[in-house]
Amino acid sequence: MLLLDCNDASMRLWRDDSDTFLMGIAWLNEGRYQFGHTAWQQARRAPREINNRYWHRLSTQPLSPALGPARHTADLVHAHLEALLGDASGEIILAIPGAMEPAQLSLLLGIIETLPVTPSGVVHRSALVGASVAEACAHVELHLHQASITPINMAHGMATTGETQLLPGFGLLGLIDDLAEIIGQQFVSQTRFDPQRRADTEQTLYEQIPSLLQALATQSEV
């Protein structure tokens, strides 16, 4: 059984005891799409060849600005899922965030049906968290372009979710932008070197931020 985690900041395919991670960023490289960390490494070097909103804006509306042969964001999602699935086949369960609109879920299921997998179930990501925690709580999710908060209730050993509240603009990429700006200002004030003036040094700065955030989880400063 396969499990697809559909948060664009943590897109994962779980298969048996292993997982494949490809966050929702696409890079058009010599006519071919590449996704995940490979695309992330080019985000500041080649911004015109990057799209990081195709999951957030999943639809069949014409893609603007254009990015290669994709007609719309649904085409990019299809290509992303092809890359994520690889040679996987069989039944698949979708873990869907509360931020995904019903029309987007319907479109996603249609895309899934064109791939060598069969959707056998859809579950709310927050319900999975609630079942794991086994008590009432609020599930805060960080997506690429927004955050969301979903209340979770427990009754008779079952987790149920309330209405998801969206926090537009408070996503992972916005957080990284804000941190990069603050760090860049410190560089300028202390060394007169501005890492954001050149694409290569700006990219290097951006790539360091996730590991800095991880370190701050256990350290007061880094």
Residue ranges and their predicted role:
Residues 110-118:
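Short helix-loop-beta junction
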Residues 94-104, 205-210, 214:
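Glycine-rich phosphate-binding loops at beta-strand->alpha-helix junctions
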Residues 1-29, 131-162, 179, 209, ...:
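Gly/Thr-rich phosphate-binding beta-strand-loop-beta motif of the actin/hexokinase/Hsp70
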Residues 9-95, 213-220:
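Conserved phosphate-binding loops in N-terminal lobes of ATP-dependent enzymes
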Residues 154-222:
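Phosphate-binding glycine-rich/basic clefts of nucleotide- and phosphate-handling proteins
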Residues 88-99, 195-196, 200:
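Short glycine-rich phosphate-binding loop at a beta-alpha junction
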Residues 45, 49, 72, 76, ...:
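Charged, alpha-helix-enriched surfaces in structured cytosolic catalytic cores
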Residues 101, 120-131:
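Short acidic loop-to-helix transition motifs that present clustered carboxylates
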